[in-house]
């Protein structure tokens, strides 16, 4: 059996933004991540690996993948122009409100803030008592104080050091988990309004490959290949990877699915009848390329 294609080789076949002629389809890559930082139902675009690291964190899986992606192949003279990222939730997820960054505030400035917040979570409006942050010892402690100002909150409040923002997360998951932006006299100072740059992500049930990918094409089709930053089947079988491949097979060879596979059985057994490559070959699925990565 021939050797598997390394991940670095994959990047060489997605060299970046090269006009396909006519009106502007770019050969961008689309990364599906199972992290919740990307809001549900959105596709984010990043122009550099540094931008990905800033958004997701320097040690994140997304940043690691982006560093390889944007580097291109050895001696390449054309680099990728953008990396698109969407959240593929592998389980039911909760709604959240993530404010814009407040990291420019000093602790003393944070301690000077006082006021109220109003937020609707899971259809129930909650109004805080007066929030006084004079006793806050840190931004994380301020989040605890904010949550405590609500009577029986149906959400938790935390401080996210990566984005430098306060995050309100519903206590429920799934489609009924919903959240709004904050109002109230303290909402502006804490950057919890849409006008301040805050974002919301509504709850969702576990994603299904075909339905999910069709929804993505309804948001944008400005990409040529897609891959996951994780094994969709979590190292057990190929059900979801096959579902992605089967969806892609119906797209008229418009996209390439770069499937990450951790199954080492083809290196020891020929034919490896349960392996993804064997199953794809037997079904004559088009448009899928496999990358072996040890688990």
How should each PLM-predicted stretch be described?
Residues 26-28, 165, 221-225:
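Short, surface-exposed beta-edge/turn micro-motifs
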Residues 148, 218-295:
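A glycine- and small-residue-enriched flexible loop/hinge signal that marks low-structured segments
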Residues 1-111, 158:
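Extended assembly-interface regions of large multimeric machines
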Residues 82-91, 160-167, 260-264:
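Short, glycine/charge-rich beta-strand/loop segments that flank catalytic centers
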Residues 48-57, 106-184, 226, 231, ...:
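Extended, beta-strand-rich, solvent-exposed assembly scaffolds of outer structural proteins
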């Amino acid at each position: 059996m021939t050797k598997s294609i390394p991940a670095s080789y994959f990047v060489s076949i997605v060299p970046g933004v090269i006009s396909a002629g006519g009106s502007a389809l770019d050969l961008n890559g689309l990364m599906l991540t199972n992290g919740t930082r990307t809001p549900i139902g959105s596709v984010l675009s990043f122009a550099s690996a540094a931008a990905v690291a800033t958004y997701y964190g320097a040690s994140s899986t997304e940043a690691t993948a982006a560093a390889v992606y944007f580097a291109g192949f050895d001696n390449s003279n054309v680099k990728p122009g953008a990396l698109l990222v969407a959240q593929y939730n592998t389980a039911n997820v909760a709604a959240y409100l993530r404010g814009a960054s407040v990291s420019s505030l000093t602790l003393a400035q944070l301690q000077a803030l006082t006021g109220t917040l109003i937020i609707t979570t899971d259809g129930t409006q909650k109004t805080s008592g007066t929030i006084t942050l004079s006793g806050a010892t840190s931004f994380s402690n301020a989040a605890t104080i904010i949550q405590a100002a609500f009577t029986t909150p149906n959400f938790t409040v935390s401080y996210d050091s990566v984005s430098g923002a306060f995050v309100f997360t519903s206590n429920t998951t799934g489609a009924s988990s919903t959240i709004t932006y904050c109002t109230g006299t303290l909402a502006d100072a804490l950057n919890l309004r849409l006008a301040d740059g805050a974002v919301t992500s509504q709850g969702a049930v576990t994603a299904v490959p075909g339905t999910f990918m069709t929804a993505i094409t309804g948001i944008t089709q400005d990409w040529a290949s897609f891959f996951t930053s994780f094994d969709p089947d979590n190292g057990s079988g190929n059900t979801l990877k096959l579902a992605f491949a089967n969806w892609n097979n119906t797209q008229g060879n418009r996209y390439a699915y770069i499937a990450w596979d951790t199954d080492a059985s083809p290196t020891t057994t020929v034919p490896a009848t349960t392996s993804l490559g064997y199953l794809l070959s037997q079904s004559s699925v088009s448009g899928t390329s496999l990358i072996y990565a040890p688990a």
